């Protein structure tokens, strides 16, 4: 079983990764609107990568008997 302190640290990082994912996605929307499709595509990929990080940590936490939780994500 994973300790409560470590579980909290993992969950805080999961939330941070998802916040970053949302930030990159918002940047992609803005770039695409301005006609910067190449940069927008790159930001979309960055968003996906951050989400993958969050999922990997959540899967690790659950596999070790912890609970993965996402805290409130502030508006980007």
Show which residues each predicted segment covers.
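Iron-associated oxidoreductase/ferritin-like identity signal
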Residues: 1-76
């Amino acid at each position: 079983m994973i300790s409560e302190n470590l579980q909290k640290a993992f969950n805080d990082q999961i939330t941070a990764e998802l916040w970053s994912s949302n930030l990159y996605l918002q940047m992609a929307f803005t770039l695409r609107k301005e006609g910067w499709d190449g940069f927008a595509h790159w930001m979309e990929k960055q968003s996906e990568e951050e989400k993958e990080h969050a999922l990997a940590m959540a899967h690790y936490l659950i596999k070790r008997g912890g609970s993965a939780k996402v805290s409130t994500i502030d508006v980007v």
